[in-house]
Curated annotation (Swiss-Prot):
One of its GO terms (molecular function) is RNA polymerase II cis-regulatory region sequence-specific DNA binding. CDD domains: SAM_TFCP2. Keywords: DNA-binding, Nucleus, Transcription, Transcription regulation. This is Transcription factor CP2. The gene is tfcp2. Residues 241-265 have a biased composition (Basic and acidic residues). It comes from the Eukaryota. Residues 133-395 are annotated as: DNA-binding. Residues 61-300 form the Grh/CP2 DB domain. GO terms for cellular component: nucleus. Component of the SSP (stage selector protein) complex, which appears to be a heteromer of TFCP2 and 2 copies of NFE4.
Amino acid sequence: MAWALKLPLADEVIESGLVQDFDASLSGIGQELGAGAYSMSDVLALPIFKQEESSLPSENENKILPFQYVLCTATSPAVKLHEETLTYLNQGQSYEIRMLDNRKIGELPELNGKLVKSIFRVVFHDRRLQYTEHQQLEGWRWNRPGDRILDIDIPMSVGIIDPRANPTQLNTIEFLWDPAKRTSVFIQVHCISTEFTMRKHGGEKGVPFRVQIDTFKENENGEYTEHLHSASSQIKVFKPKGADRKQKTDREKMEKRTPQEKEKYQPSYETTILTECSPWPEITYVSNSPSPGFNSSHNSFPIGEGNGSPNHQPEPPAPIVDVSAGLTPIQNLMPTSTPQEAQQWLHRNRFAAFSRLFTNFSGADLLKLTREDVIQICGPADGIRLFNALKGRIVRPRLTIYVCQESQQLREQQQHKHENGEPGNGAFYVYHAIYLEEMTTIELTEKIAQLFSISPHQINQIYKQGPTGIHVLISDEMIQNFQDESCFILDTMKAETNDSYHIILK
């Protein structure tokens, strides 16, 4: 009896569910071109981020976003309706992204007159690759030593301040900008989509990437950690000119389709609008904890708004003195240097980009590398520079002379011996080497001033003692005709008119 009562109830539930499903399946018919057919939440629910729930709350779908980012290149015409746009890029080519302020009057007043920070990333679109992102990027680093995945084209950019590129995060760049001013950043993507395909037999499809922008405002402590807005877009990167060919091929294919088939596809838009997304989950860690070698000092490179050229010369970056806490800076790499000291030496000698490649290398390991080894690891330019630095090679000066300062006491001793008829060849002279590159009187004056610990302005003239004791004024041409490793005794003579001195080379 119990079974007889439950069966009709179950049938009614199943039948009711089928009716609801059928009604839901018909609800979209005739609305394909309507406003309700395209749901932003559907796009944001794509498996494009590492977090499972990446779609935004439904109540925020219709709000006006504070910022908008526009990638100034056309979208692909071969994308179906309700699918996310896809944009093709050429490897290494500079593409403009416009940073637009969409705030209403009175909205976010705390940003007025303030800067915000934006962090750009190129990440994987496919979830399968997201799970192995670290291994994928490490493999790319080994195959392309010294290269970056993402770069800023600073000369072409406008309005960006303090651009930075962390040498340990090849796919990330960041900068500050003023929302009230025109801001455009030109980015370059150096990896291509086919570099991350599983099977490489030729003709395979490349994996899609995402370019994501996260923007933050300053908190009470002056750190840019308060999230304001995030947006991203799907891209594919081809070898140079490959994106143009792919765009042309897609356009020709669409032209061959019937009008009914074309209605199923989106038109190609002249620009790509980045759509809102969830912030990158590790952004606060990256922002607050730069890795060794990431220059966290505020050496800004403001970009002018007119022609994109810097409005003043940037200050030279401060030398890195303490890379590893508790270590004293070392000048030369020794065979006994520990891996930590080797890392410090790499940073001090401007090889921070390769520090991760040589993480476990001791001083002996680095010094054993051949010229071919370092060129293969670091590329020709940086490889030769690293090899010369490891071997301690110093550029040979164009001219070397040896000088000795003749003291008053030594002069009196020589004069006394001469008056008494004693031989004067027992004097002991200590010489100093002077290395000249430009071989000019100005350079010689500066080097002699350093030797005497005086200002170059205190040296009036430099003479060379000639035949019969005459004083010949030193000129650039005379210095250029000095014999290499010539020896001179320096004598000083007070100038007649001021507190300066004449130097005589004997």
